[in-house]
Amino acid sequence: MRSEQTPVLIVGAGLAGLTTALFLGQHGVPAIVADRHPGTANQPKARGQSPTIMEAFRTAGVADAMLAAAPPGRPEMTIVICDSVTGTVLHSYSEHFPDFAALSPSPGGLASQQAAEAAIATRARELGADLRFRTVLESLRQDDDGVTATLHDLGTDQRYQVRAAYLVGADGGRGTIAAEAGVGHHGRGAFGHVRTVLFRADELIEEVPDTAILMYYVQNPGLPAGSASFVSTDHRGEYVLGINDDLDRTDAEVVELIRIAVGRPDLKVELCNVGSTWEVAHRVADRFSAGRVHLVGDAAHLMPPTGGQGGNTAMLDGMHLAWKLAAVVRGDAGPALLDSHDAEQRPYGQTIADWQYVNMFERLQPDQRPDDLPEVPDPVQGLFGYRMASRAVVGGADEYGFELPTGRPGTRAPHVVLHRGAELLSTRDLFFAGFVLLTEDPAWADAGQRVAAELGVPLAVHRIGAELTDDDGTFRSSYGLSDDGAVLVRPDGVVGWRSTTIADPATLDAAWRRILDR
């Protein structure tokens, strides 16, 4: 059996796995990505990218493709509860996409998952990722030095081994890697299955408006479980029906269910793709890391789709994990840095899964709302206010929580508008490629350069008031700094350390070494 080596093997080429590969490439580390499917998503699936991940995509060269893939002229999402798409409307409301300009320089994206996966895959390949579709993981074995995986190429029917320093489990909610690594799950359980069907019905073009992104929740006793979802796509005349069970049906039976959901018994339907089923569930891994195996995406946290944060959380998992893997693989950091993946991402994944679970009742089943719903942050704090607590944060809080950015270690580095000559940019545009030191003090700038050279770790030093100007005078207050302070921002845009005192290279050296497990 042939054998090959790679620094990182990623199993699963959905949003989580592809984003991990993308940012590993951004940090100079190639990865092999294996996925059992023929290619990236062949249905629209989820839609939307939060400003927080879009900021990172700007630096990685993906944001423009995401924005270009959004359906034009749709500034809002309309949700309709009805007995059929063309029938009686029981309730409807529109959600305008909020303006987060005070918190982020990036607009949110509205690309479908299908378009997003394709864009990320293209850029990941450009940055060195080796994507292998129709490839199945058959076994894995880890030891103190790495992971050995047996892969099966379904196209050639050949089996081969890959030896990797680390394995990323991005194989979804039905994946096997978590169990093989000895990781259990907990949560509120499963609520059912959905089969998604992509179809074309030109007769609906005049009846279903394209001025908004539309989602219909159809309540009709003629449908499985008495309900279905109907969603517009990027293409006029194409729609997706979500059937609430996992039964196999003939094409004629599927067409009949579409007609019931639409309310048109004579509707002409062209089936484009009868997709596989997926599970609606609330389930979170007990650990996100087990030895040299690290979980991301649905493999780590499966959540109801109500709220649209499953994909965003998956992409954030990949971005946050990638810089840590890259730092360890390159020798910039010790292996214990990777312990922070579980310490930082598991509480966040749990919170977002809880949030989507609460949404499921508040939006769809308010009369069945259980008494023990978990407390969740408001949406703005959920997107922008997560406070991490781990050894990769120095001088922060002892426990995770939620607070809007203030420059406190463990929180998102605040967005401040700066000028570089005539160019406007954000502090957030300076991040995601490596460590960054922000300061107004030339002594701290010099200290940063010296410490980086001693550690052998790349550092971008930006002096506010020198090459970058703070014309609005908000940098210092936004970051909680004095005129002789400094902040060290990690490659994921999180404040790793902050000082409000005069320059002291030894203090920076000690803090940075702790972050990196050096």
Roles of regions detected by a PLM:
Residues G17-L18:
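N-terminal Rossmann-fold NAD(P) dinucleotide-binding loop
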Residues N42-R123:
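Active-site-adjacent segment of FAD-dependent monooxygenases/related oxidoreductases
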